[in-house]
């Protein structure tokens, strides 16, 4: 649902990972969840890569696609207003895409988001470190970040933006391919071709013992028997 909403907002395809390990769910049940993670970034990488704060959606609204769309739309509008207010601090700054890279789903986990698997993983790694710092800081005091003017200057620092804007975006960014018989020579050759085009690949086969390790590390491998209806 959220991947489709992102596509509707941007006309691009996105890679989204649902993080629901015990520690990922635990922090989303905090009573101070909505106040703890809206205070700004911990380091420059946080604001540059995943915005200064995540989008947090209350549990009671998670089952409504309309509500989800409204929350994302509100986040976008808030970000655009932030850019409009502070753009005077960086001459000739151009707005980055305003979509959240982290969405916290109260009570069930969080989503890490990117235009490809690598970007999605960067979103996860940065937020995972960020939340640990904020939670630990609050054990001894209260976490406080820099003000919005300085956040904007950091986020739109021209040299950093130039580096991000010059990233090559391949035609098939954000697409996902599922290959049956993926551990065989033909399946792995197809997978390798897709990987080179920035397509995220899921391989299905009975086992992956003989699969090239370089292919295996770049794909999601699911062991299954497609002839077995019980699977």
Predicted feature locations:
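Domain-length cofactor-binding catalytic modules of enzymes
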Residues: 1-171
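Conserved glycine-rich cofactor-binding loop
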Residues: 183-184
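N-terminal Rossmann-fold NAD(P) dinucleotide-binding loop
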Residues: 187-188
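Aromatic pocket-lining residues of Rossmann-like dinucleotide-binding sites
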Residues: 194
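Conserved glycine-rich Rossmann-like NAD(P)H-binding loop of the short-chain dehydrogenase/reductase
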Residues: 199-212
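The beta1-alpha1 cofactor-binding region of Rossmann-like NAD(H)/NADP(H)-dependent oxidoreductases
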Residues: 224-231
